[in-house]
Each structure stands twice: as structure tokens, then as C-alpha cells.
Amino acid sequence: MNNPKYPKVNYIGNKEKIAEWICEQLPVDVRTIADVFSGGCSFSFEAKKRGYQVIANDILNINYQLALALIVNNQEILTACDVDFIFSNPPKSGFMTKNYSDVFFFKEECRELDAIRANILKLNNTYKQALAFALMRRAMIRKMPYSRFTISWEKVKQLRDEEYSYSKYGRRRAYHNQSFEFHFRENLNSYNQAVFNNGNIHQAYNEDVFELLDHIQADAVYLDPPYTGTMNNYFGFYGLLDSYMSGEIRQPFDNHFMDKNQAVELFEKLIEKLKPFKYWLLSYNNVSRPNREELTAMLSRNGRKVTVLETPHVYKVTGKENKQKHTELLFLVENR
């Protein structure tokens, strides 16, 4: 294990910049950590680097594929032959062509996506498939203005016009018009080099957190739920990728933590599910609801010891003129 580096994973709310800080707060007797809203897997990746046994879970299937590729996977990489095979077929009409032509991508690009997916599914190894889908995630997002699938087609076309982009923003953003294959190959080495073995057997799940916590065992649970009052529509941002992988239009999930009025109830439900675990680590920020005082009160019931740490954190939100500067909170709970 030669100091593997977390690859480029565009993910709103990614904890890459503070993953080290969070891991440093883990109690010394922790050996197994469950990352139950794993998202872009930056925390899970850092925990794996530090030798922990990791359980990664996310309700989005594309995030589950990231966890399979980067956390559970200990050795499988994509070879040059694998990549040549993935891109060996001419474009073909299929699910993406039928449902998403001139919605997020041009029709011919959707035909390319259909051909690529068909070949990825022919790879005879789960981890190779996961790596390929992780790289296709990167490619599709690189071609998408603002890196999220909540932009109207008219805006997509406008922002992919390099002359318009240059006149408006001083940058052509030519990468939006590079091919899927170009982006896939450009990022191949960094994703392959992120595959490593820390000596442990890891697990990945694609479940609702409230179901997951009933059947896993871990010394500590790390929670990074969507923050209410922020850009937190993760199904809207990335649900298209789940539809692409499955070949069927996916529906938004329940228990999404987006509704301020529902958030307190969901946290109460979550705390109830966490009772079997010794340590809880909860990431949140200083502008969301429940607020710091409300969360502290909920978490400290029944004699639980709660410590709250904070660090400045800048959220890079694509499509926003100003980066959002908030204070990142980390609630450390010892369930005594």
C-alpha cells in the first residue's frame, strides 16, 4: 500500500478536505467503522487508508458502485484490454436514447452511453464493473455543466457552447464537449491506483440507513446525512446515474432528510437505531436544522457523552458565484 490517493469524484458535500480531521477523532479502540451515508466515499477511503475495516452504505446505487470499486475492492483494476472492449461497439439505441435524448445529453451521446453500458455489463468481474461505472460517472459528470443533473436542456446547450462560455465566463469549458471515452481514459490511472489492500475485508451496501442499522455490526458509526437548508437533493443531482446503470427510470427515495419539518423526526428515528453501537460520529453544519443545541440535546439523552468539535469548511457548489463558507460540526457520541 503506497499511500493511495483518493481519485477525483465530483460530489456535492464531499468530505475529502476534512476526512483526515474526522478520522483523527475516532476513539483508539475502534477497529470497524460503518460509513452509512457514504456518498463519494471520501471518508471511507481515508478510513481504509488508516487500516480500519470499513462498512460503506448509500441509498444511491452509483455511490454503492463507488464503494465496491474503491473500498471493498482490494486488487481488481481495469486493463487496457478491458477499456478497449468497453468502447469497442458502435453507438446503439437503447434506454438512454429513448428516455434522455436532448434532456441531458445529445441523442448521439445517449446512443454511445447505451453501447458503453451494454459492454460494461459483459465484464466478468463485479469490481471491474464497479470501477467502469465509477469512471463513467466521472465522465458523464464532466460533460454536464455544473456537474449535476438538475439543469434544463436549454441551459445545458447554452453552457456547452464554447463561444458563449468564453464570452460569459472567460473559459471555454471544452471538457464538456470531450467524449465519454476521453474522460474515462483520462481518469483511468487515478482510479486504478486508488485500488489497494489494507489487509481487511470490507463491505458495501445499497440500503436505506434505517434498514441497514438493524443488521450490521461496527465499533463506530459515521453519519453524514444530507444537511437541511442546503443543496441536498442528491437524487436530483445523481439519480440519472442510477437510471443509467439499471436501465430503468428510478424514483426518488424516502427518508431523504431534505424537508426541514421532517428532519427532527428522522434524527429521532436514527438515534433509536444507533443504540446498539458504542460510538457515533455525526457530521453537520451550523446553518441546518436541527441546530447544534437541538442535536446536542437529542444525542445526549440517556447519559450519552457528547463532544462537539468544529472546523471551518468551504463548500464548493458548482454554478454558484460564491462558495458557501460554513462551520462544519462533528458530534462525537459515546453511548454508555
Swiss-Prot record:
GO terms for molecular function: DNA binding; site-specific DNA-methyltransferase (adenine-specific) activity. It is an enzyme of class 2 (transferase). Pfam families: MethyltransfD12 (PF02086). It catalyses: a 2'-deoxyadenosine in DNA + S-adenosyl-L-methionine = an N(6)-methyl-2'-deoxyadenosine in DNA + S-adenosyl-L-homocysteine + H(+). Both this methylase and M1.HphI protect DNA from cleavage by HphI. Belongs to the N(4)/N(6)-methyltransferase family. This is Type II methyltransferase M2.HphI. The gene is hphIBM.
